[in-house]
């Protein structure tokens, strides 16, 4: 086997008892690969481990977890200064794994790990909210955000992405749309949004294709709004094709400004952010990520 530079795996603490992962790491180590492993316990650990990775001189920092772990690691990487910043590798171990699934990361741990170490590093975009918080996949607001935020951890652990749908049906009678105004390049809309998706990536909420035209290296954010006054009719209408659906508003821009008369919540790769004003902008070619050669989210 060809020699590869060292990697550091930042593993979400919930995945420490994953026996197949342990076996995959040991096998690659036996084949001569150097893989350091660090486990996160609390917020901020990923940033410290990325700094350690730079001191070790590794070529890749692998995010082992779900969308939240990928977000935390990628955010730490784009905040690094200087040269020789490691590439991002992805090892999907979360509940939904929306970003990993949409970019074509293999489900098999051994194949995903090899790709994370030896795959081609491609420059991709990230997005930033209010000059502070970042996301690599998607910002979602409205009905979908409240569902993903409120779904019990035990339900997610047992059922995975399906848990979001089940919890949503249970809560349907209490959910209301978010009234807001959204501006972008050659875009303006004001009204009631049941679901709002602003995507660098394409899917969220356990496999829902909210922004099916998004690409991660085109310098643009894709916006999709599901409008309507009542939850159930609007959700049923999402089963129609886009051409026949009057409840879908779409736009594309390198930035979007969102204003609301009341506090609303956006879910940024699994992390909630509440407020009345949001400025969301793309950060072109913000980091390098090891992706499969047939990744569908590259232009």
Curated annotation (Swiss-Prot):
Its EC number is 2.7.1.-. Disulfide bonds: none annotated. Its main location: cytoplasm. Probably phosphorylates lipids; the in vivo substrate is unknown. It comes from Shigella dysenteriae serotype 1 (strain Sd197). The gene is yegS. Mg(2+) binds at residues 215, 218, 220. It is found in: Cytoplasm. Belongs to the diacylglycerol/lipid kinase family. YegS lipid kinase subfamily. SMART domains: DAGKc (SM00046). Keywords: ATP-binding, Cytoplasm, Kinase, Lipid biosynthesis, Lipid metabolism, Magnesium, Metal-binding, Nucleotide-binding, Phospholipid biosynthesis, Phospholipid metabolism, Transferase. This is Probable lipid kinase YegS. Residues 2-133 form the DAGKc domain.
């Amino acid at each position: 086997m060809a020699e590869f530079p060292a990697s550091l795996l930042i593993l979400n603490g919930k995945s420490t008892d994953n026996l197949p992962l342990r076996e995959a790491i040991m096998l690659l180590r036996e084949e001569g690969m150097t893989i350091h492993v660090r486990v996160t316990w609390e917020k901020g650990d990923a940033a410290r481990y990325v700094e350690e990775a730079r001191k070790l001189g590794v070529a890749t920092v692998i995010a082992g977890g779900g969308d939240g772990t990928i977000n935390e690691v990628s955010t730490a990487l784009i905040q690094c200064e200087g040269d020789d910043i490691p590439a991002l590798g992805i090892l999907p171990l979360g509940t939904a794994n929306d970003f990993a699934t949409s970019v074509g990361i293999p489900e098999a741990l051994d194949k995903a790990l090899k790709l994370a170490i030896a795959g081609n590093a491609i420059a991709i975009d990230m997005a930033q909210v209010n000059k502070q918080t970042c996301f690599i996949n998607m910002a979602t607001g409205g009905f979908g955000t409240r569902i993903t935020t409120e779904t019990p951890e035990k339900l997610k652990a047992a059922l995975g992405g399906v848990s979001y749908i089940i919890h949503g049906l249970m809560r349907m009678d209490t959910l209301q749309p978010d009234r807001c105004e959204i501006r972008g390049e050659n875009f303006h809309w004001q009204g009631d949004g049941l679901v709002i998706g602003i995507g660098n990536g394409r899917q969220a909420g356990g496999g829902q294709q909210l922004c099916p035209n998004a690409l991660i290296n085109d310098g643009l954010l894709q916006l999709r709004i599901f409008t309507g006054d009542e939850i159930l009719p609007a959700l049923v209408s999402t089963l129609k094709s886009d051409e026949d659906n009057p409840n879908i508003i779409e736009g594309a821009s390198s930035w979007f400004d969102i204003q609301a008369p009341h506090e609303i919540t956006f879910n940024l790769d699994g992390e909630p952010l509440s407020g009345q004003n949001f400025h969301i902008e793309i950060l072109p070619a913000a980091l390098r990520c090891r992706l499969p050669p047939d990744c569908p989210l590259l232009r």
